[in-house]
Amino acid sequence: THPSYTLYTSGTTGKPKGVQRDTGGYTVALAASMKHIFDAQAGQTYFATSDIGWVVGHSYIIYGPLIAGMTTIMYEGLPTRPDAGVWWSIVEKYKVTHMFSAPTAVRVLKKQDPSWLKKYDVSSLKALWLAGEPLDEPTAQWISDALAVPIIDNYWQTETGWPILTLANGVEQQTTRFGSPGKAMYGYAVKIVDESTGEELTGPNQKGVVGIEGPLPPGCMQTVWRDDARFVNTYWKSIPGRLLYSTFDWGIRDA
């Protein structure tokens, strides 16, 4: 339970919230996610295009791949500098097997000359994971056609440290439609609830707040740094009528 780090959320309103993460639980969560979500094997190569200032950088540039015995690539720069083939040249040069990026970056690449993708051998790549914002279907379809590998959306937060919703292909081969981040990972009891009443919305296509029943699984935040009361009041008491962790994000159950 000893704190491993404090990472401030990217919210733009109010006093910044320092997410305090533990050490043991976080290590367990990352080890499990590398095996069960990413189907990672020692000796493979992981390339997350994030920055270590973000949670993806902590979890899947620094700690996760190294825990799994993988080589991890740390790259600083834009996906279009010096040219729009720079990421794919890295994939070719280092035989990247697992790649993690964001929909915005893919949308930027989509606007570039498509021939850049054909200049490099990306056959080592097993899948591309995307997170950080909603992944629209046209973008997912474009990069799927371009790379000819599974494109796997996943949803989570700075606060959770590892994916809430995704596919656990290290357990069994799963599929989902483009535009959906998949299903809840083990440990996350995800609910869609009415923002005003706290009532659970169980039908398809009903929009509500994404909540999680406690206790949260290993790897999630312990508290807000030096402000336990704010942790409870902000995250656990914002949904009326029930003690439920609020992600403050909207979600729709599609089935």
Language model: regions and residue ranges:
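Hydrophobic beta-strand positions
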Residues: 9, 192-193, 252
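Conserved pre-ATP/AMP-binding loop-to-beta segment of ANL
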Residues: 1-8, 15, 25, 30, ...
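Hydrophobic alpha-helical segments in the ANL/AMP-binding
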Residues: 35-36, 56-68, 87, 140, ...
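Conserved adenylate-forming
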Residues: 42-43, 68, 77-206, 213-219, ...
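Conserved ATP-binding/catalytic segment of the ANL
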Residues: 211-255
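Adenylate-forming
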Residues: 26-27, 182, 231
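Thr-Gly-centered strand-to-loop micro-motif
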Residues: 21, 48-49, 74-76, 130-131, ...
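Conserved AMP-binding loop of ANL adenylate-forming enzymes
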Residues: 4, 25, 38-76
